């Protein structure tokens, strides 16, 4: 019989989270997305897309100086449109539990619509996620962006996790 052992991962849970948002408008979708990343402050990082869990006790801070090219765990949403005059939006929220031993929830949402509509929706999503778990919310923090399309427009919002 084969002996089993615990798997050890070289990763530690990040202990900070930064909410960022940006917009871009360019001649093609990828450059619009890249411009939105740059305007949010994380355009020179390698984003590793994660699901929507904030590690317990992680601290929400302004975006720190992260070395270019770093692999950064990130939950994000974005909306791209080619329709001139259309407004696109993206938002992200973080719900922090009253019980600090529990994880927080990160919710992302994108839409054709306004920044306000998007941010309201993403905050409701955070409330719903806590309700499904039977947890009490201490605080919800959110950010959103909107872009009215000229060429090809992109709205972007993210929660970048990092280490203190």
From Swiss-Prot:
Cofactor note: Binds 1 pyruvoyl group covalently per subunit.
Entry GO MF terms: arginine decarboxylase activity
Keywords from the named record: Decarboxylase, Lyase, Pyruvate
Site (Cleavage (non-hydrolytic)): 51-52
Alphabetical list of Gene3D superfamilies matching this protein: 3.30.60.30, Pyruvoyl-Dependent Histidine Decarboxylase, subunit B
Enzyme Commission identifier(s): 4.1.1.19
GO BP term, example: arginine catabolic process
Family matches, as Pfam families: PvlArgDC (PF01862)
InterPro entries documented for this protein: Pyr-dep_his/arg-deCO2ase (IPR016104), Pyr-dep_his/arg-deCO2ase_sand (IPR016105), Pyruvoyl-dep_arg_deCO2ase (IPR002724)
KW Lyase (keyword) present: yes
Cofactor field: pyruvate
Domain of life: Archaea
Modified residues (Pyruvic acid (Ser)): 52
Reactions catalysed: L-arginine + H(+) = agmatine + CO2
Protein family (similarity comment): Belongs to the PdaD family.
UniProt name for this protein: Pyruvoyl-dependent arginine decarboxylase
Organism listed in the record: Methanococcus vannielii (strain ATCC 35089 / DSM 1224 / JCM 13029 / OCM 148 / SB)
């Amino acid at each position: 019989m084969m002996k089993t052992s615990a798997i050890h991962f070289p990763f530690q849970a990040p202990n900070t989270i930064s909410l960022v948002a940006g917009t871009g408008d360019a001649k093609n979708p990828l450059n619009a997305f890249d411009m939105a990343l740059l305007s949010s402050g994380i355009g020179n990082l390698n984003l590793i897309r994660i699901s929507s869990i904030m590690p317990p006790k992680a601290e929400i801070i302004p975006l720190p100086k992260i070395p270019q090219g770093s692999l950064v765990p990130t939950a994000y949403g974005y909306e791209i449109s080619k329709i001139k005059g259309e407004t696109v939006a993206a938002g992200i929220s973080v719900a922090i539990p009253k019980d600090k031993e529990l994880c927080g929830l990160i919710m992302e949402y994108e839409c054709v619509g306004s920044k306000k509509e998007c941010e309201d929706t993403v905050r409701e999503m955070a409330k719903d996620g806590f309700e499904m778990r039977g947890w009490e919310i201490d605080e919800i923090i959110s950010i959103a962006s909107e872009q009215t399309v000229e060429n090809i427009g992109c709205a972007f919002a993210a929660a970048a996790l990092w280490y203190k």
